């Protein structure tokens, strides 16, 4: 299982001191180890912010990860907001379920894996670490962008598909 979320939102603690990182780290540390990946994507531009915009919710305005795709087997759920009860009862027009579409589910699963590779990952101690091949995005943003661009190009090349004439989408 892979969980990918935004670094700024996922590490920001609530009034109780809880964050997505503190709530999800036990999945990796105590329970499932190598069966679980928990990644926090950190946009490289947020490291350049200074002063009153350098922490808290204000920082999220300048660079937040908004991919909201959920892959289950060969099914894909694309949403526009949180996975909350209110969202699925009052705002059903903002989600789409695509069932039994293995190529699309594989595409999104691979995209999530690539983005998780480019993210801070919860290690076996519950700490956030980049993979050894990646620089930290806020310390070396240019190097990070170049590495990520290469990774995304490779992903796009692997998923390049030609649709035969006469086939419907």
List where the protein language model places each region.
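Charged, low-complexity intrinsically disordered terminal segments
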Residues: 1-68, 72-169
């Amino acid at each position: 299982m892979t969980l990918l979320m935004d670094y700024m939102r996922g590490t920001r603690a609530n009034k109780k001191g809880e964050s997505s990182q503190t709530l999800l780290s036990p999945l990796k540390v105590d329970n499932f180890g190598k069966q679980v990946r928990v990644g926090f994507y950190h946009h490289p531009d947020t490291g350049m912010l200074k002063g009153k915009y350098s922490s808290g919710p204000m920082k999220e305005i300048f660079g937040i990860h908004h991919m909201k795709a959920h892959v289950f087997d060969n099914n894909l759920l694309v949403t526009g907001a949180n996975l909350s009860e209110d969202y699925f009862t009052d705002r059903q027009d903002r989600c789409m379920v695509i069932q039994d579409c293995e190529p699309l589910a594989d595409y999104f699963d691979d995209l999530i894996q690539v983005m998780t590779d480019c993210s801070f990952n919860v290690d076996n101690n519950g700490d956030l670490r980049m993979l050894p091949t990646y620089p930290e995005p806020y310390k070396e943003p240019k190097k990070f962008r170049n590495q990520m661009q290469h990774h995304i190009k490779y992903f796009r090349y692997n998923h390049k598909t030609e649709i035969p004439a006469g086939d419907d989408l």
